Design a protein with these regions (language model features):
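C-terminal segment of classical bacterial N-terminal signal peptides
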Residues: 2, 7-17
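A residue-level marker of the well-folded mature domains of exported/periplasmic proteins
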Residues: 19-368
Length: 368
C-alpha cells in the first residue's frame, strides 16, 4: 500500500516500458550506506524499486539491494562495495545517495566511464567528472519542512490539544548530522514556524550519525523536558528515538521521509503527520526515463511540491490529530509555495543562503 501511494503521489507514468533489445531485463543495483528498516529514507528507495518491479515484471526490470551498514566501522567498505558492483559489469545503473557517498561515487564515475549511476539527495560536483554517466536528483525538503514548522508553531500554542503546553512557544528539531541537506530541512522548518509566530523558539540538536536511536532518544527527551512539546526528526534511524521520546513524554513528533504514523501504528497518536521526501518515486521516474534513453545524465534536477518530489501526509489520521483550522492554513501555505507566492529560502543550490545567514536564522530562534 505504501509503495502504491508513493507511486500515485508523484504521478509516475504507468505506460508499459519495454525490455532491452537483447531480451534481458533492465538491471539496477541499490547500494545503501545504511540498512533497511529505518521506516524512512532507505525504505522509501527500496519501496520505489519494489513497486517498479511489481509493475513491470521481473522480465523487464529487476534490482538488487545491498545494505552496506551505517556505522563508523561500515564506512571502510562503502567504496570497495561500489567498485565491486562496477566490476560486475552487469548492472544498467548503480544507485546510491547521501553526502557520505559523494567521494566514492566521484572516483567510481571517473574510473568506470561506461557505468551509469543515479545519485540522490546530495549535489554531485560535475566539475570533478561524471558529466556523461551520473544523473543527480535532489529534493526541495525546505518546502515541506516549512509546512512542518508552521504546523508545529500553530499546534504548540493550541489549547485544544492535550499533548502541548500552550503557555510556551518551544518546538524541537533533531538532525542526524550537520550537512547541507539537513540544514535545508532546518531553515525551512524555522521559516515556516516564524511565519506564524515570530517569537517561536527552536531547541536544536544533532545526533552525529543517522543510526543511533538511543542517542536520538536521549537528546529528544532533553528537548521535551526543557519545554518543547513538538519535535521534528530528520535523522534516519536515529530519529526513531525522538518518536519514542515523544511517546514517553506525552508529546508530539513529526515523521520524515516515509509515513511514519502508518509504519509505526503503536506510536501513531504522537505523530501528527510526516514530511515525505519521495525518494522511491524519483527513482521510478529516473529509471523509466533511462529505459527510454531519455534520462539526462550530467544533470541535477530538484523536486519539490510542484514536481511531486516532496509531500505532507494528509490522510484520515492527520485529519483526526490536527485541528481543522490549522489544516486549512497549511493547505493555503502549500498552495502558495507550489505557485510561487511563498519562496522558501534554501541551504542548497545556486541561490543558497550563506553560512552566516543560516547561523543568523538559527540564532534568531535559539532557546533561552
Amino acid at each position: 500500500a505504501l509503495s502504491m501511494a508513493m507511486a500515485l503521489s508523484l504521478g509516475v507514468s504507468t505506460v508499459p516500458v519495454m525490455a532491452e533489445d537483447d531480451g534481458e531485463p533492465y538491471k539496477a543495483a541499490l547500494l545503501l550506506n545504511g540498512t533497511l528498516g529505518d521506516k524512512s529514507f532507505y525504505d522509501s528507495a527500496n519501496a520505489g524499486l519494489t513497486a517498479l518491479q511489481e509493475e513491470l515484471g521481473e522480465d523487464v526490470f529487476t534490482f538488487k539491494v545491498e545494505q552496506m551498514g551505517a556505522t563508523a566501522a561500515d564506512e571502510a567498505k562503502w567504496e570497495p562495495t561500489l567498485y565491486d558492483y562496477c566490476d560486475d559489469g552487469s548492472y544498467d545503473v548503480i544507485i546510491c545517495g547521501t553526502f557520505q557517498m559523494l567521494a566514492a561515487l566521484t572516483n567510481a564515475a571517473n574510473d568506470y566511464p561506461d557505468q551509469k549511476f543515479i545519485y540522490f539527495d546530495e549535489m554531485f560536483d560535475y566539475t570533478a567528472g561524471g558529466e556523461e554517466n551520473v544523473y543527480n536528483v535532489m529534493y526541495k525538503q525546505n518546502e515541506v519542512s516549512y509546512l512542518v514548522g508552521a504546523m508545529a508553531a500553530l499546534m504548540t500554542t493550541d489549547d485544544s490539544l492535550e499533548m502541548v503546553d500552550p503557555s510556551n512557544s518551544i518546538i524541537g528539531f533533531l538532525g542526524g548530522m550537520e550537512n547541507s541537506v539537513i540544514k535545508d530541512f532546518l531553515v525551512g522548518y524555522i521559516q515556516g514556524a516564524q511565519a506564524v509566530n515570530p517569537d517561536i523558539q527552536v531547541a536544536l540538536a544533532y545526533v552525529g550519525n543517522f543510526y543511533d536511536s538511543a542517542a536520538g532518544k536521549d537528546m529528544a527527551l532533553t528537548q521535551y523536558q526543557n519545554g518543547a512539546d513538538i519535535g521534528f526528526n530528520v535523522a534516519g534511524s536515529a530519529g526513531l528515538g525522538q518518536i519514542e521520546a515523544a511517546v514517553d513524554s506525552g508529546r508530539y513528533a513529526f515523521g520524515v521521509d516515509s509515513d511514519q504514523a502508518a509504519l509505526l501504528p503503536d506510536y501513531a497518536a504522537n505523530i501528527p503527520t510526516s514530511a515525505i521526501k519521495n525518494v522511491g518515486n524519483s527513482l521510478i521516474r529516473a529509471i523509466k526515463l533511462d529505459m527510454e534513453g531519455e534520462l539526462p545524465y550530467g544533470t541535477l534536477e530538484y523536486m519539490g511540491f510542484a514536481e511531486g518530489g516532496v509531500e505532507l501526509v494528509k490522510d484520515a489520521h492527520y485529519e483526526e490529530v490536527v485541528p481543522e483550522d490549522i489544516r486549512t492554513q497549511i493547505d493555503e501555505m502549500q498552495e502558495q509555495i507550489t505557485n510561487g507566492e511563498i519562496e522558501v529560502q534554501s541551504a542548497l543550490g545556486e541561490n543558497a543562503m550563506s553560512e552566516d545567514e543560516i547561523q543568523a536564522l538559527i540564532d534568531s530562534v535559539q532557546v533561552g
